C-alpha cells in the first residue's frame, strides 16, 4: 500500500542532507533506475513547491548517464579491455521513464568490440509486486516476454539498470536452465572490462 505522506516526509529529510553535498559542488549519482526516477521526477511531482526537491532533481544523474557524460566531456581512464560473449541489456521501465535514452547501452558501447542486444520489455518485478505471494505469479507472467528474448539472444551476460528487475529476469531464466552468468548492473560490466 502506498504511503504518500511518509514518502513526502522522507523526501524532505533526505533532500536536505543531499543538498549539503550539492552546495559543495557535487552531483547526486543514483545506482538504480528506480532511485533516479524517484529523485528526478517522483519527488518533484509529490512536492512541486519544495525548492530543495527542485534543486536536487536538477543535480541528480543515473550512474550510466553520469559515465556516458564523463566519457563525452573528459574521456575514460585508459585500460578498458574487451569482454567476450556479448551482453543482453534489459532497459528497465524506471530507466525508460526518465526520458534520458538508453544510457546503459550507451555506456556499454564504451567497451571495445562488445556485442550488445537490448530488451525493452517490462521485467514484471515492479518493486515489491514481484516478491509478494499474491502477485508473484503475475510478475512472472509479465516478465516471461523479456526473459524469452534474453534466452534467445544467448549472450554470456545479462545486465539491467534495475538490479531487482535483473534478478527477477535471472530467476525466470533459471527456470529454463539457461547458463549465462548472473544478472549484473551495467556498471559491473564496465568494472569487469577494467579488470576491477
Predicted regions and their residues:
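Iron-sulfur cluster-binding electron-transfer modules in prokaryotic oxidoreductases
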Residues: 1-196
